[in-house]
Amino acid sequence: MTTASSFEKDELLKCGHGEMFGAGNAQLPVGNMLMMDRITHISTEGGVYGKGEIIAELDINPDLWFFECHFPGDPVMPGCLGLDAMWQLVGFFLGWKGNKGRGRALGSGEVKFTGQILPTAKKVTFHINLKRVIERKLVMGIADGSVKVDGREIYTAKDLRVGLFTSTDNF
């Protein structure tokens, strides 16, 4: 298990290039698909369910790539990117705990969007509460997540599921 409890952007990019958890193990996306600038807190303790939590942030500015194309004249961050950020964090948690394999999102339960992220926002905060971590032949994290923009909760997702797979050939 990696013992650090927070990570800056350069460390997240190293994770994306397979330099944090080892080749063939959990990676974050790089470039435009990395949906966070930092992880401010990660722990196997705490959270709503007492099974661990992760808090991460994304700085918002009007020049972010998605505002230009979604939608011209009505810029808003796509909600699916916030959902993907939550999956990214569950996968990161599994790798951070020392589990092996490549991460894949496996689904979620109920997802609710009750607000939006506009170019005028300053900061998005992602909060993941682990509900269950299975560490057997199958490695899977199940978590609830929320997204806040400038302190106001705007998305929630129940039962986010991410697995780590030593082979994705038959996936």
UniProtKB/Swiss-Prot annotation:
The active site is at 70. Its EC number is 4.2.1.59, 5.3.3.14. GO terms for molecular function: (3R)-hydroxyacyl-[acyl-carrier-protein] dehydratase activity; trans-2-decenoyl-acyl-carrier-protein isomerase activity. Pathway: Lipid metabolism; fatty acid biosynthesis. It catalyses: a (3R)-hydroxyacyl-[ACP] = a (2E)-enoyl-[ACP] + H2O; (3R)-hydroxydecanoyl-[ACP] = (2E)-decenoyl-[ACP] + H2O; (2E)-decenoyl-[ACP] = (3Z)-decenoyl-[ACP]. It comes from the Bacteria. Its main location: cytoplasm. Homodimer. Necessary for the introduction of cis unsaturation into fatty acids. Catalyzes the dehydration of (3R)-3-hydroxydecanoyl-ACP to E-(2)-decenoyl-ACP and then its isomerization to Z-(3)-decenoyl-ACP. Can catalyze the dehydratase reaction for beta-hydroxyacyl-ACPs with saturated chain lengths up to 16:0, being most active on intermediate chain length. This is 3-hydroxydecanoyl-[acyl-carrier-protein] dehydratase. It comes from Marinomonas sp. (strain MWYL1).
